[in-house]
Amino acid sequence: MKLLITSFVAMLGILVGLRSVINKVHKLPELDLQKWWGSGSRPEEQDESIRPFKIDFNDSMISDLKQRIKNRRRLTKPLEGIQSEYGMNTIYLEKILTYWVDKYDFKKRVELLNRFPHYKTKIQGLDLHYIHVKPKANNGIEVLPLLMLHGWPSSSKEFDKVIPMLTTPKEGYNFVFEVVAADLPGYGFSEGTNKPGLNPVQIGIMMRNLMLRLGHKKFYIQAGDWGSQCATHMTTLFPENILGYHNNMPISSRLISHFKLVIGSLFPSLIDSDRPERVYPLKNHFKYLLRESGYFHIQSTKPDTIGVALTDSPSGLAAYIMEKMAICSNRDQLDTPHGGLANLDIDDVLDTVTITWMNECIVTSMRLYFRQINLLNHYFIFNFSIPTDVPMAAVKFLYEVTYQPDWILRDKFRNLVRSTSYNFGGHFAALHTPEVLADDVFASVKEFIKFHSTSKYKSTYLRYPHSNLICSCQSALKFRARIAHS
């Protein structure tokens, strides 16, 4: 008995000590909020003008693109009985390349892209491109600023289906959105930097500076993929500016969160997970990540090398981009020629490829992966450990790259005021399920407003302190006990 008590005390001591390490919260780093990312050194006088911009698919670009596709070398056919398991099915790719040359209407597509007002302005030395749509609101309808941030390999084009839904008054809501959809630096029509170190933290600073230039000291954010990384850092660094954060790729990267995932796999009965089948067994998730993360490792280590091939060949660029857009739209369709790409409108997909091709920005977009992995940027890593009190809403689509239950998300986002899960949809929510995304943004912002307007709306983090592992397990056990006795 004495040995048992001693062992229990020792184990408890280990857990307490381990918790103090993995649950450590670092101090906010000191950052230069006007760091110069343009060529050379910062000039004494800076251009802060806002310039109208038009997208142009010019004849020279179109002619060169088509000629390169027509002159491509013979593509290697898939193995017998293989569809998309080895990557892009080249028989299916041939059909898309033919469509791109013969049927993709470049002029019609550019007119569609230009239906929104486009602008450029220099932020910290880089020419940033953004879409800015102001709604025509009726009396009594409040206009709320919303910053939208995309990821790889996209641009602000990703939001062209959802923008009209967000800028149109919606029945049951007394507000509508003024949308600012920005291209991340080095993506789309935004200039890339020639200086190392421009990571998601620094991009978050730039996006805040963009909104301040547009006159918005307080605003909401909607983001996914890399955009969600940038936005998460914004909520950590600038909570006074962010009224609410809608995230369609919600992740807590705190060490305590990763520890909980492991504990949950060992003791699943202790874990209060809303959809455990999306998390466990962990080996299935790791198997998926191992299978599909080859591009991540390439872009995180030697982006410039693979960039040579992708910059020189539109056929190669199309295959590279479309294969990832396919798998992120439905990972269960590898046994089909399209591999999941059929879930997206092919014109939307080719818009993304064409924009990347014409701007020669595949290398500058991929370099963001290298900067993410560079551990020398210690403040970037430390930022993950700092919780934020900015209210956050999570929307989780079935085929998102990763999934975390709410009790883990609260480690980072202490005021998780809304969470919805869907048994459909994927990573490119604004293209794949724009109506659902727009509806969720409206509903979430309504919760954000409620959060700010009433003192009775307490933080779920305070009611369920899941950052404490022991409390997490106790809460789950008490919850299950209530269910058992009801």
Where are these regions (language model features)?
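Short beta-strand element of the alpha/beta-hydrolase
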Residues: 142-151
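Terminal signal-anchor or tail-anchor transmembrane helices
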Residues: 1-30
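Glycine-rich "HGGG/HGxG" loop immediately N-terminal to the catalytic nucleophile
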Residues: 106-108, 157, 184-198, 232
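Non-catalytic accessory segments flanking enzyme active sites
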Residues: 61-134, 360, 364-378
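Conserved alpha/beta-hydrolase
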Residues: 166-189
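Conserved acidic catalytic loop of the alpha/beta-hydrolase fold
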Residues: 201-219
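Conserved hydrolase catalytic core segment
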Residues: 169-174, 217-259
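C-terminal subdomain of alpha/beta-hydrolase-fold enzymes, centered on the catalytic histidine
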Residues: 13-15, 299-466, 473
